[in-house]
Amino acid sequence: KSEDFLGKKTMFVFMPFPFSSVCDGEICELRDNIDAFKSADTDTVMITVAAGPTNRAWANHYNIEFPILADFWPHGEVSKQFGCFHDGVGISLRYTYITNEENVITEIIKSDEIGVERDFEAYKEKFSIS
């Protein structure tokens, strides 16, 4: 629920395919830089249309500490509300929405290509990661 995030800056990271090479690379890059996000008082929440057990296995496999939420049923409903659902394939697109404490989206980092990762330089710039 969106009210769960009121009062917190949050980075909502949508992913299409847990356990795929591009998504694996992105999740590991986020994991490896999580301290920079925390230093900016920003919570990280990942969302996929995969089922909860798949997301838990993925998080465990890569030692992920931030939550990975299942937008499984109704299928892709949260992704649709954010405007990042691909109807033809039935997946979340690679969009990251950064919100302020009032749940207002202040920045979007995205890749419109399913098989192309987001440019991590955008995260580095936003969060002063060297």
For each of these PLM feature ranges, what is it?
Residues 1-130:
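Chalcogenol-based redox active-site neighborhoods
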